[in-house]
Amino acid sequence: MQATIHNEFLTLTVDTHGAEAVSLKNAAGEEMLWQADPAIWKRHAPILFPWTGKLTGGTFTANGKTYKGGQHGFARDLEHTLLRAEGDTIQLELRADDAMKAERFPFDFVLTSTFRLEGKTVHHTLTVQNPAAAAQELRFGIGYHPAFNVPFDSAHTTEDYEFRFDQPESPMILDASPNGLLSGRCYYQWKNANSIQLTDDLFANDSFCMAGLRTKTLGIYEKDTGRSVVCNVAGYPYTLIWSAPAKPVRYVCIEPWHALPGAETDPQEWSERAATACLAPGQQWETTLSTTFDR
């Protein structure tokens, strides 16, 4: 099922499968989200929960039992309950049930996704709650993975675009092995850079996971017109940029994360792995990604 909201600038459609934004159009009716061509990348803007990236060994252990887990968790692959779709807001919820705890993740949780339109900005808030009746603490990872159409129109090509910071940056890049797990190494790709030129080969070796950014915003800009899609990444310890290795580039992802993918040296025990947060029963945690579409 899908729900749609709109204002004078934006029309947003969210699917209950994965609580995923699947369409965002501007006032001219131009589609700004990637439309999930399965030959290139079959998603639009998935939610990453309860982990980001890959698990070491594709598994984790909790309470003496081993669980298998795919990339980026499972929230993106499940049906969420639509709570509200009116005015400028869409809200959905995913609750752990007995089957989920037996097969996927043995912890109680409530994940609430709230989309709100404000002018040309989409605010997407993720709230994680450990229910008061839960038997144990909740450890989790979480992140965003929106994909934006590039080029913005047929008159432009890949080289007409660049990523821009709002101040000079020398981001530390966390290196990943070919298997997608962090290697434990890091390097510097750009120094004192205000921008990163987009090319068809930029992501030939996969994504760039940037740590320690000081910038409040990171956006993709059309150089000759100034049109842009800009994400507020303030407060996120890690921000990734990525696109599938298709030529020419068809979309770019700007991905603020509160957790890292698995590392080659990670323990199997879930309680020993790094997490976004650890919530005692009755506690909750939330984050918001605000993205402005000036195009």
Which residues make up each language-model segment?
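Acidic/His-leaning functional-site neighborhoods
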Residues: 10, 26, 72-84, 193-274
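Asparagine-centered strand-capping/turn motif at beta-strand->loop junctions
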Residues: 14, 128-132, 243
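Short, Gly/Pro- and small/polar-rich lid/capping loops
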Residues: 1-8
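Short Pro-Gly-centered flexible turn/kink motifs
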Residues: 14, 60-68, 126, 277-294
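Acidic-aromatic substrate-binding/catalytic surfaces of carbohydrate-active enzymes
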Residues: 8-66
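Active-site/ligand-binding surface loops and adjacent short beta/alpha elements
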Residues: 135, 139, 147-234
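Acidic, contiguous internal or C-terminal segments within carbohydrate-active enzymes
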Residues: 101-153
